[in-house]
Amino acid sequence: MKLTKYLILSAALVLAAGCAEQKKASTIGADANLEARVERLLSKMTLAEKIGQMNQVSAGGDVSQYADAIRNGQVGSILNEVDPVKINEFQRLSVEETRLGIPLLVGRDVIHGFHTVFPIPLGLAATFDPALVEEGARIAAIEATAQGVRWTFSPMLDIARDPRWGRIAEGSGEDTYLDARMAEAMVYGYQGREADTTSMAACVKHFVGYGAAEGGRDYNSTFLTERQLRNFYLPPFEAAIKAGAMTLMTSFNDNDGVPSTGNTFVVKDILRGEWGFDGLVVTDWNSMGEMINHGFGEDRMDVAEKAANAGVDMDMMTFGFLSHLEELVKEGAVKEKTIDNAVRNILRVKFMLGLFEHPYVDVEAAKAVQYTPEHLAAARRTAEESAILLKNNGILPLKGKGCILVTDPMADAPWDQLGTWCFDGEKEHTVTPLKALQERFPGQVTYVPGLRYSREKRERFDDVVAAARGADVVLAFLGEEAILSGEAHCLADLNLIGSQSELLAALKSTGKPVVATILAGRPLTIERDLPNCDAVLYSFHPGTMGGPALANLLSGEVNPSGKTPITFLRTVGQAPLYYNHNMTGRPYQGETLLADIEPEAGQTSLGNTSYYLDYGAYPLFPFGYGLSYTNFEYSNLSLDKEEYSSYETIAVTFTLANTGDYKGTEVAQVYVRDLVGSLTRPVKELKCFERVELAPGESRNITLQIPVQDLAFWGLDGIRKVEPGQFQLWVAGDSASGEPVSFSVR
């Protein structure tokens, strides 16, 4: 996908830019044509200068560490520096003390907010609200670019079906369609619908299949076929590229034996060849060097050659390009035109961001855009929409003036509340649930710490249980610390860690109603805890304003509307379990569980169907699930036609009614099943969703449009197309509900 949407802006920046900030950059010329500017600069560069642009270094700390390398034209990008004073100095070195004055591209992991931290991406996906997610990404870009960060290594688009994998927190869950919609939203948010000096280049990652790591262990191998890649794992990346994503990152994993950073098929053939991507491709941290560990290359020279010829433009922290590309070009192992094309892609991004015209930032002005009331309000709204009500026996919303006991370990954990992969959030600005509840219910809240952190043992249980006996309701804030999810933080046991389940049981033994609010980076296995809870509100680490959001939800000021973006397992032994699995030859038709088997039973296949003897076939909560304080009813589902051609659009009409007592928002979800195909097809696939707000007693007729082309898949013949035949379609509040209607495609 050609990066043309920012061309007009490039011209505008050139015309508007003053000379004070440019100095040597002004020698490049003020040509409004982006490609002409790129070619003009490229033609002036020596081979060594070109290779320098392909080198990225981690420059956090002392500016002098890389000052000489920058002066010598050996650095094209830095990461891990957010101090605007230092960034300005790095830029000054590059713009004013190098021959061509090419500015640096400054990168940072701005994953779910910069200073104002939003819910982790798995929580963002739980909103099913792309517009709100785009707003959050726009705020992150405004805050980060004000300090000189013009490139974020986000969004992560790895489909993840195994909650043991720590980085499940950083993505949008298990569904391809939802992931694609979130990808588009974050790209639009980071880069802006129209580029300006607050545009921060998005970097979609990790290309590709990283989330399918075998056994849920980070960095592990993946074994995905081409059809699996094309039907499930690649579409979110393609959607992000079509939305204008400027950059892409390769992944750590090897798929079917080929490490991503040296995978010509996915990078050069699909990304570059089929999709026409002319943006910047960067390695993940030392993933070029790690190809040596994979056994895919002998040394840094070998893997540098493989990465360059696969279509990688920039090396993050291996220094393989810097050390060996010039020699590889002389030997003919890498063509100079390959280097030229890589540098074109790098320069193109720098021009599109306006870095040649605006390499510096206003240090004082940067402070004014952090933690603004508008940003904090958006973070609160997002945290509200991301929370999922999993159980409610009528105890929520909180009523009356009674005594509320609040207990740990997540009630007053300002750092852990921010979630994983959060480098610039500050716990001093975090509003915790305890603080927010004390403000919401003045004089009613008693706080008794039970566990200081999620892994602590039960030394203080007696104090908490005694306090519970005197309370009218117990609010237990449970979950996992931020450090327990994220990169390299995988778990084999997904139960509430430490003594938290024991704490819940002890609280329930008092006979008082217990509300569990769980803050975590993944879907934990909480089946054993449900009997000890009268209500469960699940919040994937909610960020800076998680406290006010949860207080609003628990009090009924806001009605929960979040939906599960990932299947919640009954036990870790079910992993991976996901809703859009293929139909088997022996689909589920009932089960015989362990308790049903007689002693010395004769050998039998116990029903000839697909399930576990101890845990059955179904998850604890399916994809798309989430309760409300009100009730929603679906009716009158119909389609505008019974048969469609492959280029028509299906009009799906249904009635949604709020039959309860509270105003609420329902996420109406449309699922489709292809009954017969040239390949076995998923039992259901999400094809559309819509957030609908209804007042008590209100009903609304809703029509959603689904292009028939959205039913296409990559088949045996290596072509993506819609196959004619019979289909079923559901509209429901989750992936396991509703009655289908039928249609056909000719």
Regions from the language model: what does each represent?
Residues 1-27:
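Bacterial Sec-dependent N-terminal signal peptides
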Residues 6, 736-739:
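Short glycine/proline-enriched turn or capping motifs at secondary-structure junctions
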Residues 18-714, 721-735, 742-746:
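Glycoside hydrolase catalytic-domain context in secreted enzymes
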